[in-house]
C-alpha cells in the first residue's frame, strides 16, 4: 500500500506498469507511438514524439502495457480529486493538457481573473518568466495595460522555487533573472 502523491512506472520482464495515486495529485498520460505505447507525466512529451490517442490516466488506476497492448486496471479506489495546484501555475509546460484543460489557457484565465480582482494603475505588465508569462499576458489583456518584458531569464539556471532552502532560492533567483533596468526606470509596473 502506497500513501502519498505519486505517478510512477515499473518495468518488469513481461510488462510496463504505470500507476497514478488515488487523488490524481500528479499527472500521468498514455499514448500510442510507432505501434507501441508511451507513458509520460505530461501530454506535451507525448505530442513531441508524435504519439496519438493521448489520454490522461485516471486517478487511482494502473496501466499495464505488454505484448497484447495497454489495459487500464483497477488500482486504489479514487479519492476526492486533488491535482496539485503547482502543476497549473508552475510545474506543467504551457503546451500540456491537464484535466482536459490546456495549461496556457488556464494560466491566461488566472491572469485575467487577477486583473479583475486586483486592478492596478500601471504603465506596464511584466512576468517572472517563464511560468507566469501566460498569466501576465492575461492580466494585460483584461486590464488594457501593455505587456512587455522586464526580466531576462538565464536559461541555464534550473528551477529555483523548489530549492530546499531560502538561501539557495535567493542565490538561484539572483543568477537566473536580470532586470531590464533602463526600460523599467520611472515606470509603474505590475509584476505577475
Which residues make up each language-model segment?
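Short, flexible hinge/linker loops that cap or flank conserved catalytic cores
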Residues: 183-185
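Secondary-structure boundary/capping motif
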Residues: 114, 187-188
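Structural motif
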Residues: 124, 188-190
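N-terminal segments that mediate ammonia production and transfer
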Residues: 1-132, 140-181
Amino acid at each position: 500500500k502506497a500513501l502519498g502523491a505519486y505517478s510512477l512506472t515499473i518495468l518488469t520482464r513481461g510488462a510496463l506498469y504505470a500507476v497514478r495515486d488515488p487523488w490524481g495529485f500528479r499527472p500521468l498520460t498514455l499514448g500510442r507511438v510507432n505501434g507501441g505505447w508511451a507513458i509520460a507525466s505530461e501530454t506535451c512529451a507525448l505530442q513531441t514524439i508524435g504519439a496519438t490517442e493521448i489520454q490522461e490516466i485516471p486517478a487511482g488506476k494502473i496501466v499495464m502495457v505488454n505484448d497484447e497492448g495497454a489495459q487500464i486496471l483497477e488500482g486504489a479506489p479514487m479519492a476526492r480529486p486533488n491535482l496539485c495546484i503547482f502543476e497549473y501555475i508552475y510545474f506543467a509546460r504551457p503546451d500540456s493538457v491537464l484535466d482536459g484543460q490546456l495549461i496556457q489557457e488556464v494560466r491566461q484565465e488566472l491572469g485575467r481573473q487577477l486583473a479583475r480582482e486586483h486592478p492596478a494603475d500601471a504603465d506596464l505588465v511584466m512576468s517572472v518568466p517563464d511560468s507566469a508569462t501566460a498569466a501576465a499576458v492575461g492580466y494585460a489583456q483584461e486590464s488594457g495595460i501593455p505587456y512587455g518584458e522586464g526580466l531576462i531569464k538565464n536559461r541555464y539556471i534550473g528551477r529555483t522555487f523548489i530549492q530546499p532552502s531560502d538561501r539557495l532560492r535567493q542565490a538561484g533567483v539572483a543568477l537566473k533573472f536580470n532586470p531590464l533596468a533602463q526600460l523599467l526606470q520611472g515606470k509603474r509596473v505590475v509584476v505577475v
